[in-house]
From Swiss-Prot:
It comes from the Bacteria. It comes from Staphylococcus haemolyticus (strain JCSC1435). Autophosphorylated. This is Sensor histidine kinase GraS. Member of the two-component regulatory system GraR/GraS involved in resistance against cationic antimicrobial peptides (CAMPs). GraS probably functions as a sensor protein kinase which is autophosphorylated at a histidine residue and transfers its phosphate group to GraR.
Length: 344
């Protein structure tokens, strides 16, 4: 904001006093005009002198008081304003002291809440880690069961529990994901096969197979743990809304970028739901009675894709299925993006 605009605002706030001073001087001029014993020239000189001194006083006052408002306008910290003692009159000082006390109290509350949230997240993370130990032991016990329908059912339920625990674990790690990432060159085929193996019990229970067309020599520069999480959530989403039809997974290069395509033939996503599928907690506006979906999986995908530099594109037709296309960045592009994030 320019100084002229600041001065105009200053004059508007003092308009009552200015009008009052002008009014008093007009009365003096009127009295001099009516009373012949009073010299109009003398009164005119006095009025001119008073108005000139008043203008100088207003300019001087403006230069002193405007510093406080300019600091507030520029979003300066209240501590800086208080330290520089920019408040000139008692009213301004009371306002600054009030804001200082209020903001200090709010900051203390925010710190307390952040510590509470961190403590809760830490407790939840420890709980998930602790509960995964008996879940792993449960898997060993299930593996000792004889082959049959009972074992398949147990493996299916175990896989669902393990998936939910992993989802919750990654959800609690979102805030610290930047510190938790380690980028390295790895085989995309290996990442996909590992996740297919992890979800095989659910796919077998639903009669769904995997049609894999993965090029052997395609490597990506990424964080293995978080990238696997993205693939897992997309596979989980495809398995959840498919029944009895294979999921096609293929990899290829497109314009120098490694691309992973996951296509299912499930119920698909409606056109009006497509822009919202990455929102936390969003499930569907069509199938409102759906209780198996939490709306967390694709939210996790959306939360880490930018840090990994992966572009995610979704195509879907109701009744025909959904295709997720993951385009990986080149290593130099990812490094440049990470540098930009670091310098921001």
């Amino acid at each position: 904001m320019s100084n002229l605009k600041w001065f105009w605002l200053f004059l508007k706030t003092r308009s009552n006093w200015i009008f009052w001073i002008v009014f008093l001087h007009l009365i003096l001029l009127g009295m001099a005009y009516i009373d012949y014993d009073i010299s109009i020239e003398s009164i005119g000189f006095i009025v001119t002198l008073n108005l000139g001194l008043t203008a100088m006083f207003l300019i001087f006052t403006f230069l002193k008081e405007v510093k406080l408002y300019q600091h507030l306008y520029n979003n300066k910290e209240i501590e800086e304003i208080k330290h520089k003692d920019l408040a000139e009159d008692p009213f301004q000082k009371e306002v600054v002291n009030y804001l200082y006390r209020k903001l200090t109290s709010q900051k203390e509350r925010v710190v307390e809440q952040q510590l509470h949230i961190q403590s809760t997240e830490q407790s939840l993370t420890e709980f998930v880690h602790d509960i995964k130990t008996p879940v792993t032991a449960m898997k060993l016990l299930i593996d000792q069961e004889e082959e049959g329908k009972r074992k398949k059912s147990l493996l299916y339920e175990w896989a669902r529990i393990n998936e939910l625990l992993d989802k919750q674990l990654y959800l609690t790690r979102l805030e610290s994901k930047n510190r938790d990432m380690y980028f390295e060159e790895t085989s995309l085929k290996r990442l996909v096969i590992d996740e297919v193996q992890l979800t095989r019990h659910i796919s077998q229970a639903k009669g769904i197979g995997y049609d894999l067309d993965l090029e052997t020599n395609l490597d990506v520069y990424t964080d293995v743990k978080w990238c696997r999480m993205m693939i897992r959530q997309i596979l989980s989403n495809s398995l959840k809304y498919s029944q009895g039809q294979d999921i096609i997974i293929r990899s290829y290069t497109n314009d120098g970028h490694v691309t992973l395509e996951i296509k299912d033939f499930g119920r698909g996503i409606s056109h009006k739901d497509l822009p919202r599928i990455f929102e936390r907690g969003f499930t569907s506006t069509v199938n409102r009675n759906e209780t198996t979906s939490s709306g967390i999986g694709l939210y996790l995908v959306n939360s880490v894709k930018d840090q990994l530099g992966i572009n995610v594109r979704v195509e879907s037709t109701v009744g025909q299925g959904t295709t997720f296309v993951l385009t990986f960045p080149k290593q130099n592009e990812l490094m440049a993006r990470m540098t930009q994030v670091t310098t921001m």
